[in-house]
């Protein structure tokens, strides 16, 4: 079953279905850039709002999504990790707001590892709690190009075929019991409670799997079970991952697949962001693992 048929079968609201289909269509455009810029993997000489050097493909993917959405007028608000402000689309046909990490893991491209795109959809402006999100999706560009999405009616995975259509691969994904851990940050910088939690996971036989691509690592957790973490750490106690562009969309997908999301204390999706660049400590994965880190944090 192709994506269009699936959205129709699920009874997805017409305008939302149109937007999801449109966004999925940008996967091919993003992947085209992999070939056209494959010999230029250095920095562009510009930085995003977080002070990170932008790579040519960061800017290329950002341009693909922004220009396509502006031309389509399917959304009113666009916020991306590469921009320092929310873009308001003139003459928008809908009130949707989208948050986008155009190319997660772009530093891995020069060694030909998986990268991805992360997108969250709101009914209106994007400076809202993550629980207000009405849909979330990611596209994983690896040996296969995969689309995983939720509209709060299960989590579903599609694979892109030769024609460009996305075809159903897995319906109603649920996180299984598993023992994979994907921990970000340097061990020497861990805060006490996080370090204790990591030791517990290691003692219980959790295997370390961390690629440097948030999308790829969470995708593996969805299929094999376990937990992804990028904590607050020495020098960055507030965390590193972006609440709007990364944490909220991926948190929605994981929670809809039967998992949980937390900043170590509570579900970060209940936080109203004060700025588009807000960051958060992040733990997502199985409910058991998330309950354990929250317990470690409470105990200090």
From Swiss-Prot:
GO terms for biological process: fructose 1,6-bisphosphate metabolic process; fructose 6-phosphate metabolic process; fructose metabolic process; gluconeogenesis; sucrose biosynthetic process. It catalyses: beta-D-fructose 1,6-bisphosphate + H2O = beta-D-fructose 6-phosphate + phosphate. Binds 2 magnesium ions per subunit. Pfam families: FBPase, FBPase_C. It comes from Methanoregula boonei (strain DSM 21154 / JCM 14090 / 6A8). The gene is fbp. GO terms for cellular component: cytosol. It is an enzyme of class 3 (hydrolase). Mg(2+) 2 binds at residues 101, 104, 246. The keyword Cytoplasm applies. Its cofactor is Mg(2+). One of its GO terms (molecular function) is magnesium ion binding. It is found in: Cytoplasm. This is Fructose-1,6-bisphosphatase class 1. Pathway: Carbohydrate biosynthesis; gluconeogenesis. The keyword Magnesium applies.
